[in-house]
Curated annotation (Swiss-Prot):
InterPro entries: A/G_cyclase, A/G_cyclase_CS, H-NOX_domain_sf, Heme_NO-bd, HNOB_dom_associated, HNOB_dom_associated_sf, NO_sig/Golgi_transp_ligand-bd, Nucleotide_cyclase. This is Soluble guanylate cyclase gcy-31. Its cofactor is heme. The lineage of its organism: Eukaryota, Metazoa, Ecdysozoa, Nematoda, Chromadorea. It catalyses: GTP = 3',5'-cyclic GMP + diphosphate. Belongs to the adenylyl cyclase class-4/guanylyl cyclase family. It is an enzyme of class 4 (lyase). GO terms for biological process: nitric oxide-cGMP-mediated signaling; response to oxygen levels.
Length: 702
């Protein structure tokens, strides 16, 4: 399916429901593109994916959506000026419907691999007609009905009522029969005009059969039994052996999609017919062109699947069927379909075989003259399309990188609000129930006095990298890190009723992770952290312009910080509010140890508790509760890490210089000692590294 139809569906959704709904439809359907190139082929099922996704998002019935989208098709075509072709397709509405197949043939110049539907009319009267619609695609009936209603109003100011008569499925085709009820004022006007002609003048206009077959060199005359009675002089030169044979065994009917029978042809005489020889035209040993026929019933579908190169081996004719009452036969008046002169030469045809009175000679010569120009233009257009696709891919990649940076600075839900044009003030929100965790490293200042600045950076980098991995799976969000302080919240920006439980699970894992870190250069013997937790209400929002940050405001932040300051090494100190919240939601989940009250401010005290242990399995947060700083909606290659590092150049970045300096000195470096542990040793030291020490807290949290 070409992008013209897909782009029409996308345009309708955007104009009817808005960009936000279109974004939801893309997400539900798994589509990533915003625009669709008109002449590019897409998956056959993509249109149905978009329609069903729109149904899921908006709740509108699928049939109603298809009808409304079809109704907007004529307006959509005005962007590409295809509406100008529709205006001249027929003088009346029935003529327009009969000319739709011809329109699709015209569109093959723009869409060479087009698989169009077929339309033909019968039982026309003053009150309407019966329309047959055949297509290899299913599910577009309401789409076509919407097109018919809209075009009848736009071009012919006629109201049409569509009555569905029958639906059949045969040979991978969907055959729909509809009765179109409308006021057909032009019915029989043309026949009346012909009957008013002077009969005496018509009697004087006579023509012999020899002249007739000379004027139409590729005519085929066959009787009711489908046997070929005579052929034109041009066809006689290349297919002399077909006279007396059945036309439906000598040729295959490509268009329209009907059975190759006398009755069917009589019903569809207003349609363009395309025939293709059932066997290829070949040359004998003497170089004389001969035609071989067999009685093998070859499927027409095989010809439809053939490529242009394979079809050139067969003779294709396109024309119209006329019933000759005097001969009691049907005349097929057509011309060969030749894409270029070499094909005509291989078929044994020459320019003088074509009629003088029509433009067939001019078309063949003009096609050759324009072939080089068209090929050049097509090559240039193809190159432009490739460049556009490459630019679009680069744009998408840069957009993903920008999103990745944004999601590292702000929560994904808040960042998406800002991207959609909302102000920073509009992103501010009050959260009545959140739980905040503060941690810091015990005697961090004393540690820094024995380490170089680069060692301090590497030390914090390893610790916080492991902490970041923990929070991604615990339904919490890292607000900020200042020095050795690490602040985490649960319940904002994504609300959850298990915020206290998620925070305590995360804090417990922090202690276990810190206890597994040792140092081998005798500067740091062990790493202890302390943690403080408090629950309450906060106001959250984005602060700053040049460097926007997601910040929390309120007394809850202050109290949580006080909990951390009054905690003990490798301990989690929680406030009475958090303690009560855990006990109310899930009694006995955690074992607590009561501690003395601590002063908060202005002689205000609060009861505190140490977390001793946990009982039962950990609760797994839902994906929507995990506000990661990474955008995991897109998968990218490793080279996307260039987003956070300077481009490769002759000058080294400060980060790479610092890492090299550490390697040369052979000082502090951290590597995992187990699935979650850290081992520190000197890479350049000749001493064998000691076994890592288990520095889990003495009263471990299980």
């Amino acid at each position: 399916m070409y992008g013209l139809i897909i782009d029409h569906i996308a345009t309708y959704i955007k104009e009817k429901y808005g960009e936000s709904t279109w974004s939801e439809v893309k997400f539900v359907s798994g589509v990533t593109d915003d625009t669709f190139q008109m002449d590019k082929k897409f998956s056959e099922g993509l249109s149905h994916k978009l329609i069903w996704a729109c149904h899921d998002v908006t709740g509108d019935p699928v049939d109603e959506l298809m009808t409304n989208i079809g109704t907007s098709f004529y307006k959509f075509l005005t962007k590409f000026e295809f509406n100008k072709v529709l205006r001249v397709l027929g003088r009346t509405f029935p003529q327009f419907l009969n000319g739709l197949d011809n329109l699709h043939e015209y569109l093959r110049f723009t869409f060479p691999k087009l698989k169009p539907p077929s339309f033909y009319c019968e039982h026309e009267s003053r009150t309407g007609l019966t329309l047959h619609y055949r297509s290899k695609r299913r599910g577009f009936l309401h789409y076509v009905q919407g097109q018919i209603r809209n075009i009848s109003q736009e071009l012919f100011q006629t109201e049409v009522v569509i009555e569905l008569l029958d639906i059949e499925h045969d040979l991978n085709l969907e055959h729909v029969i509809m009765r179109l009820h409308f006021n057909n004022l032009d019915f029989n006007r043309q026949g009346t005009a012909y009957r008013n002609l002077n009969d005496s003048i018509l009697e004087k206009v006579k023509i012999t059969s020899d002249i007739f077959f000379d004027i139409f060199p590729f005519i085929i005359v066959f009787n009711r039994g489908m046997r070929i009675r005579n052929i034109g002089i041009g066809l006689l030169r290349v297919m002399a052996g077909i006279v007396g044979k059945k036309i439906n065994q000598t040729f295959l009917l490509m268009r329209p999609f009907i059975r190759f029978r006398w009755e069917e042809i009589m019903l569809h005489s207003n349609n363009i017919f395309e025939l293709i020889s059932s066997d290829p035209i070949q040359e004998d040993e003497d170089g004389i062109l001969v035609y071989k026929t067999t009685d093998v019933d070859q499927m027409t579908e095989e010809r439809h699947r053939m490529g242009d190169g394979e079809r050139e081996k067969f003779l294709s004719l396109k024309g119209q069927m006329f019933y000759m009452e005097e001969w009691e036969s049907i005349c097929f008046v057509g011309i060969p379909v030749m894409s270029h002169l070499p094909q005509m030469y291989k078929s044994g045809l020459f320019i003088n075989d074509f009629a003088l009175h029509d433009s067939s000679r001019d078309l063949v010569l003009a096609s050759t003259q324009q072939s080089a120009e068209l090929k050049l233009l097509l090559h240039q257009e193809a190159q432009k399309s490739r460049n556009m696709r490459e630019n679009m891919n680069r744009l998408k990649k840069e957009r993903r990188r920008t999103d990745k940076l944004l999601y590292q600075m702000l929560p994904k839900s808040v960042a998406n609000q800002l991207r959609h044009g909302e102000s920073a003030v509009a992103c501010c929100e009050r959260f009545d129930s959140v739980t905040i965790l503060f941690t810091d490293i015990v005697e961090f200042t004393k540690m820094c006095s024995s380490l170089t600045p680069l060692e301090v950076i590497e030390f914090l980098k390893v610790i916080y990298t492991n902490f970041d991995k923990i929070i991604d799976t615990h339904g919490v969000y890292k607000v900020e890190t200042i020095g050795d302080a690490y602040m985490v919240v649960s319940g904002a920006p994504t609300k959850t009723e298990h915020d206290a439980e998620f925070i305590l699970d995360c804090a417990s894992q922090f202690l276990v992770e810190a206890g597994k870190m040792v140092n081998m250069n005798n500067k740091i013997h062990k790493i202890d952290i302390r943690a403080g937790v408090h629950s309450g209400s906060v106001v959250a929002g984005v602060v700053g312009l040049s460097m926007p940050r997601y910040c929390l405001f309120g007394e809850t932040v202050y109290v949580a910080n006080k909990m951390e300051q009054n905690s003990s090494p490798m301990k989690i100190l929680v406030s009475e509010t958090t303690h009560n919240k855990i006990e109310e939601s899930d009694p006995g989940l955690y074992q607590f140890e009561r501690r003395e009250e601590i002063e908060i401010k202005d002689d205000q005290t609060i009861q505190t508790f140490f977390v001793v242990s946990r009982h039962g399995p950990h609760r797994v947060p839902s994906p929507r509760n995990c506000e990661s700083r990474q955008d995991d909606s897109q998968t990218e290659d490793d080279d996307d890490d260039e987003l956070l590092l300077p481009r490769k150049s002759g000058r080294k970045s400060p980060t790479s210089e610092a890492e090299e300096e550490l390697k040369k000195k052979g000082q502090l470096s951290f590597t995992p000692v187990s699935d979650a542990g850290i081992e520190c040793h000197s890479r350049n030291s000749n001493k064998t590294p000691r076994q890592s020490q288990d520095l889990t807290p003495r009263k471990s949290i299980t």
